[in-house]
Amino acid sequence: MFVIKRDGRKVDFDKSKITIAIGKAQHSLLKDNEKIANSIAEEIAQEAIMLQEIDIKRIEKMVFDLLVKHKQKDVARAYEGYRAVREYRRITNTSDKDILELIAGSNKETINENSNKDAYIIPTQRDLMAGEISKDIARRKLIPIDIMEAHDKGVLHLHDIDYQLQPMNNCGLPDFKDMLANGTVINKKKIESPKSFQVACTVLSQLFAVVASSQYGGQTANHIEEILAPYLRKSKHKYEKMFQNEDNKEALVDLMVKKELKDGIQTLQYQINTLMTCNGQSPFLTLFMHFMPGSEYEEECAMITEEILRQRIEGMKGPDGVTISPTFPKLVYALDEHNAKPGSKYYYLTKLAAECTAKRMMPDYVSAKIMRQVKDGQVFGPMG
């Protein structure tokens, strides 16, 4: 006896496939009943023996009707949902409608999927169009049916379906400190270790963009002040040499270092918010702020942390000239013994962070003390 498939092919009748399909529908509702599944499969098998050839659509209808007959209406509905996803997967092209709606601006699900993507500009639209094709293939060929069915029903939300096809990582904690200290390669060009704070900020912003173009989730600059502190000292040494014969050498050096610090952090903030990655988005970036007293670059770390907070308090201007709170980079500030208590050495930074939070809803806070307890004595930023 044979089953006539949708494309007209004839294949041998396999009763176990009916049992498995019913079992999956039952399992999705935690109502496993092998006896009923086997009974229905046997009834259909008897029909197939009598007919010798049976159409796949007839089998599906019989499964549904027999489930209802066995007082399994909810399982019958689950089977219909399972069958609908299978039917979707058989279709060779299902993305045309979604792509046309995306171009027209009416595909709200895709448009609103990520806050750092402006879906109304051409580069982003092209990325999203490619994403719709990837999503379509993933839905039909890659993602398990029960997960896809749960997504469609709203039981769960499978985020970034459009990136599931390729072997890309999601969020990460790249070693930016090493890339700046030892140099790196961008677009097949060797990037040497920066010789000044301003250049370090510029190179770092380029690294953020490159990482964002190579993955689909967030990234964190872990201990951002420690990453940049050595280059602030290099700039200081540069100015000390420049003004070595001046009577007011210290005042001039201090003035120039503070100016370069402000300019560098401003460059970083503006580059992050204006650079576009290859998929038309701003880098989804977190700056994690935490340093320890007694470290080699303690003074520079404190200066950098303060400047990051002050510039976030100042905000950025939107297209209409009104000051706004930039979404990125996200800021995370670690509370520790040396900054959390009144009278502690860096309590002034925590007060500044609190002022920033009151005005800009950032930074978020983590407890360094608790993190050490649960993370083997380590303190580090969130992954993205």
Model-derived features with residue positions:
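Charged, amphipathic alpha-helical regulatory modules used
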Residues: 1-106
